[in-house]
Regions:
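Membrane-interface loop-to-helix entry segments
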Residues: 23-24, 160-223, 262, 284-293
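Transmembrane helix-loop junctions and nearby membrane-interface residues
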Residues: 78, 121, 125-128, 132, ...
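Hydrophobic alpha-helical transmembrane segments of multi-pass membrane proteins
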Residues: 64-68, 108-116, 166-173, 250-258
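Membrane-interface "cap" regions at the ends of multi-pass membrane proteins
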Residues: 1-60, 70-75, 219-228
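Extracellular/periplasmic helix-exit of transmembrane alpha-helices
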Residues: 208-217, 289-323
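Hydrophobic, membrane-embedded alpha-helices of multi-pass small-molecule transporters
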Residues: 23-43, 163-170, 223-308
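Inter-helical loop and helix-membrane interface segments of multi-pass membrane transporters/permeases
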Residues: 53, 122-166, 172, 209-250, ...
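Extracellular loop-to-transmembrane helix junctions
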Residues: 41-153, 157-159, 289-295
Length: 323
């Protein structure tokens, strides 16, 4: 008996490859905010550094200017990211809009900057994070061992290298675990940092300048240092004052702050992992949400510190080690 074959027309359905977009809008917004201007380190390193490097700097006013300058940049990246969400960065954009050699140069610079930045922030972890945290904890607990460890992480090259290698190893482990795991670590660290920032802002909001001076004098004397007034006099802070109209101070301050503030578009490099990456409104909300978060918290932090500590003291405290 002959078997009659039947031809069937079927709708082709693509079988899943297991490639799932893992990043939500919240993940991407936090990613942009923390990679661009982590609040604590930006206040300590970029903003207060400008007080001494460029006398007359007005960090609060410059932060507003920096935010305005970033608006057209973010619009451009958001629209390009939504138009070509799977290309994973600006190589395709630059090569199509300008030419491929410029795209290669641009991305090679990005790679080298990333490598140098990884080394810098690994050292940053030892010198500006781990060391001061141990010294502060040891001072509050009257524990000389913690203070000694903290000083070693800031001054001893072997301790600095050990702390940096631990950070690099931890980052490598996190990235190897994959995108979802990376964002869990990122968001967990973000929540811890935000808790510390909120507590610090609340303390500053209810603190007084007189209370700060009294506590500073008591703590600094335990290390053999002088009073707050001595610091101001030694650092020449008595006549320091912000002047936004002073272009000799404002322009270099703008470049310094933009070094941190200009990266709120960075999520375009992971658009292949972002859910609904082709949605323009979503891309705009992610980038502008990060910009608003950074700008508002940095301005609040600077204003609170200047209110309690004073512009004169912050200027002198940053210049005093160089005297």
């Amino acid at each position: 008996m002959a078997t009659t074959g039947r031809s069937e027309s079927r709708l082709f359905v693509r079988n899943s490859t297991g490639l799932v977009r893992s990043a939500s809008a919240v993940d991407a917004t936090i990613f942009n905010a923390v990679i661009s201007a982590p609040i604590g380190s930006t206040l300590a390193w970029s903003i207060f550094f400008t007080l001494v490097a460029f006398p007359g700097a007005d960090p609060v006013g410059v932060l507003v200017i920096a935010a305005i300058i970033n608006i057209p940049v973010l619009i451009m990246f958001a629209l390009l990211g939504a138009s070509m969400p799977r290309v994973g960065g600006d190589y395709v954009w630059v090569s199509r809009i300008l030419n491929p050699p410029l795209a290669l140069i641009s991305n090679l610079c990005m790679i080298m900057g990333g490598l140098l930045g990884a080394a810098y922030f690994a050292k940053f972890f030892s010198v500006f994070a781990l060391g001061p945290a141990l010294v502060a904890g040891g001072s509050l607990a009257h524990n000389n061992t913690l203070i000694s460890w903290g000083n070693s992480f800031q001054t001893d090259k072997a301790w600095i290298l050990a702390g940096a290698l631990v950070m690099v190893a931890l980052q490598t482990y996190i990235l190897i675990r994959g995108t979802k795991s990376t964002f869990r670590w990122q968001n967990g660290a973000f929540l811890i940092a935000m808790f510390g920032i909120v507590v610090a802002f609340i303390v500053l909001a209810f603190a007084s300048k007189g209370g700060f001076v009294s506590n500073f004098n008591a703590l600094n004397s335990s290390f053999g240092g002088g009073t707050a007034q001595n610091v101001i006099a030694t650092g020449g802070g008595a006549h320091a004052a912000p002047d936004l109209g002073n272009m000799s101070a404002t322009l270099p301050t703008l470049f310094s702050i933009q070094g941190f503030m200009m990266w709120n578009f960075w999520s375009v490099y992971m658009s292949g992992e972002l859910k609904s990456a082709s949605n323009r409104r979503r891309q705009l909300w992610i980038m502008f949400g990060a910009l608003a978060f950074d700008t508002v918290l940095l301005i609040i932090g600077a204003l609170l510190i200047f209110h309690v500590v004073g512009y004169h003291f912050m200027y002198a405290a940053n210049v005093a080690p160089n005297k």
